[in-house]
Amino acid sequence: MSILAQIIGLACLLFWGFWLCCKLRLPAGFAPLCGLCFCMVVLQLAGSCNQLWLGVQLLLVGAVLTLAQRRRHEILPQLLSPGVLAFCSAAGVLMAVFAIRQPEFQTWDEFSHWGIYFKSVFYQHRFAVWDTTRSLAHQAYPQGLPGLYALFALPAAQYREADVLFVTALPLAAAASALFALPQVTARRPRIAYTVCACLAAPALFWLFAPDTPYTTAYMDAPVGALFAAALCVILLPCAANSRVQRGLALAFLCGALTTVKEIGTVFALCVVGIWFLQCLQDALRDKGGILRGFLLPFTAALPCFAIPLAWKLLLKALHRADDQFSSMGPGYFLQCWQEARTGFDRYFYDVWDRYYARLRSYPLLFGASTFKVGCLCAAAAVLLLIVLIWAMGRWQGLRAALPGLCMILYWPLYQGVLFYVYICGMSPYEALEMASWERYFCCFFLGWFSVLEGEALLAGFAAAHRLPRMAGHAVPAIVPCLLVCSTLWGIWQAGGAASLFCLPKADWRTEQQQIAADMLTRMDGAQNGSIWLLSADDSMAVQNMWYYQYELYPAVTAVEAQSSETDVDLGYNIGEHDVTWLVLFGVTDDFTARYADLADDGLRSAQSTAPALYAVTNVDGRIYLTAK
């Protein structure tokens, strides 16, 4: 993706965002967030209808039309607002660093699922769920960010993983812009100092909330946490009685975007709706009227929380893609595991609970503190900010501003229950007992909680400035941004110093593996729409090889299965059953070679040190023939 393609995509987001902020009565600093969420929702719906490229073209044309309707003197103040400058600062740093370093995928799910989603968008111009290449990637995940990638990939000449990582980092930059857009900065306040702090902190504000770095992974946990944080920032904004419908529509776009990132995003979206419901009810009680509106208004934000996931599930079912690892996540399986543990038939439920509880109490998550302690510290900070906000803003306004942070105290134990349910029903026994992805799942929740506390602190600082002497009134609003800059620098230092920001990690093993994959494609003579069966001498590497090489060889060929050659494999039956066109051997045992030597003219050979053994498969009337390549 050229710099020009990135600029076109960012401009499209901003122009749509400015138009939406005008219609929804939001500060201009929320334009990056509004534009991002609007495009994600539109492209998720367009991709679900197999019209992804049409949706991209309509968004680009619409952005040009919205720009043509606006005057120059209206756009410039919006571009110079602290929130927009913070977003542009973060995007600019990422563009420069990624162009220099060209980071790559490094971890399991980036190859097995998310990478295939983005490659399908680039090569097939459609979501993977519509793909005809029989990819084994799980189809249950919604694909809002792969859809957003289409907006940037349309003018791109080639597929690059750095471009994918850039797109997945945009929700974090948009959340930073929403956070710094919260204070209503006026000419009497230190606007320049505040804006400079925002631009310095935004590029790496969320460094603490990812196991490695939040900007160099295609996992969706950091983006879903960032959008959760941004939605909470929207709730923090003061809302006049005549603009509550518009605020509900803004939250509807945000909640809809949350549901398109990952399935857990629906849980976060419902959390946002719950807080919005309490705020609407509080406003109705304060105004002594409109109680019915206070009850009904939150449903404008709740509708996308149910409509978008339901439409996606119906599409998966219609395309026969609904059966995957998440099919057992109904309450029946959870109750079955609990019943078996209670009767002593199988202790699996209790074993997972014991490890879950131990990890919750003792595993260091952030700042060297356990997950439980971090939650307690956040709860204490929420109560303290309630007191400060009531003092600075008055009882009603202070309680309204502190409500999101207080509600997170209630959501904290509920979220623990949701994650325990996921470990029981949505993961393999090995993953559940190892507490896999613990940091990613909890950090996305704390990313939202930390951000709403930071937003409340910003509001408290600017509100308290009116109650303090002149010099103190100028200094207090700058305290929180300065603390954010310091915490950002501390997080970068904890992650490995400046090298972690400007010298992004690259997996050295990728160079050799990419060369092997390219050599395989060369030996396949440019095969298209083929399928491969991978066999490995090392049982622990069988599945890893399948996922990795399926990603590297996509879309020319796709993997249909992977097994260890040490298992009792019926090679002829499996090849015929799965319509395999290529057989790849990553080392085989002598017994395996002896059993199937008659399938190849010169017998089976093991993998060489530089490349696996590759055979073309020919099926003649049920008789399998292997030809070495």
Put a short name on every predicted segment.
Residues 1-79:
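Membrane-embedded, hydrophobic transmembrane alpha-helices
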Residues 41-47, 247-263, 267-274:
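Membrane-interface alpha helices of multi-pass inner-membrane proteins
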Residues 67-78, 268-303, 559:
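Perimembrane helix-loop-helix junctions
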Residues 81-95, 253-255, 287-318, 407-408:
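Hydrophobic alpha-helical membrane-interfacial segments at the cytosolic entry of transmembrane helices
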Residues 93-194:
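Active-site lumenal/periplasmic loops and adjacent helix-entry segments of GT-C-fold
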Residues 102-104, 278-282, 291-387:
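Membrane-lumen/periplasm interface segments of specific transmembrane helices
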Residues 119, 220-228, 267, 429-460:
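Hydrophobic/aromatic-rich transmembrane helices and adjacent perimembrane loops
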Residues 485-546:
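Membrane-embedded, lumen/periplasm-facing catalytic core of multi-pass transferases
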